[in-house]
Amino acid sequence: MELLDLKKQGINIKEQIPLSRYTFTKTGGEAEYLAFPKSTDEVEKLVKVTRENKIPLTIIGNASNLIIRDGGIDGLVIILTDLKEIKVKDNKVTADAGAKIVDTAFTAAHHGLSGMEFAAGIPGSIGGGVFMNAGAYGGEMQEVVESVKVLTRAGEFKTYSNKEMEFSYRHSLVQDNGDIVLSATFSLTPGNKLEILDHMHYLNALRRYKQPVEYPSCGSVFKRPTGHFVGPMIIKAGLQGKQVGGAQDSTKHAGFIVNKGGATATDYLNLIHLIQKVIKEKYDIDLHTEVRIIGKEK
């Protein structure tokens, strides 16, 4: 069986689609094939066909913390945003990989469950958030994840415990082994619904005030080096507001790179490399990217 056979069976598969339509940066080249599975069964079929036909496979969630190079991606790209069910039982919330982190956090809040307030403004998907152990305002996914259901590249379903996920700062096991996150279950604490929602609305207001939400952006680009803060280093190095092509280090929040109009992925990457070079020269600190960079050069 081949990919186009699955298309005939009703799986949503497109060809030669610009990924800039889906990324938060509004940049990125074309996907050779692009699929939007609507069920775990469809994901399993797609993975099996790519394995049997030796087709390269790339998994994407909400594409919020992602830069796709201008040459695009060969093989099949699966976007999981149509897998978005969120279920609540007792003190646990289970969300599909494509469910938005924000929607999951607010669903928990409306059920009077506390623990995901930190995630109220994180724009990514559950799969991506678990993949990178996303965090904000002092909280991280690893603090609330109870278990993660995955599909291995070999086609096996597994469930990992929190410990087995090997979470660390902006890292998890699935970054290393290539397993595909299908859903995650969060263990939360009963609380006062109105107080939880008030705190989430406060954090969202703070985010809008501090972050350049008015421009396309992939969020915070760099991991925080131990003992240092990226934003102040960029400001002191005279790099805030620096622009390469259409990509600019935000004048509102140093360390966020925004698309001021017409930016390419190459603009983003050239600006990232410039910032890394200058920070290394001035502070002898290596800045590592938090944002995921994939695809091929044009």
UniProtKB/Swiss-Prot annotation:
Name the keywords, alphabetized: Cell cycle, Cell division, Cell shape, Cell wall biogenesis/degradation, Cytoplasm, FAD, Flavoprotein, NADP, Oxidoreductase, Peptidoglycan synthesis
User: Which cofactors?
Assistant: FAD
Q: Which Pfam families match?
A: FAD_binding_4, MurB_C
Q: Which InterPro entries does the protein's record reference?
A: FAD-bd_PCMH (IPR016166), FAD-bd_PCMH-like_sf (IPR036318), FAD-bd_PCMH_sub1 (IPR016167), FAD-bd_PCMH_sub2 (IPR016169), MurB (IPR003170), MurB_C (IPR011601), MurB_C_sf (IPR036635), Oxid_FAD_bind_N (IPR006094)
Q: From the UniProt record, report the name of the gene that encodes this protein.
A: murB
List the HAMAP family: MurB
State the protein's name. Answer: UDP-N-acetylenolpyruvoylglucosamine reductase
Pathway(s) the chain acts in:
Cell wall biogenesis; peptidoglycan biosynthesis
Compartments, as annotated in UniProt: Cytoplasm
Q: What is the lineage of its organism?
A: Bacteria, Bacillati, Bacillota, Bacilli, Lactobacillales
- Where does this chain mainly localize? cytoplasm
EC class of the enzyme, as a word: oxidoreductase
Transferase found in the keyword field: no
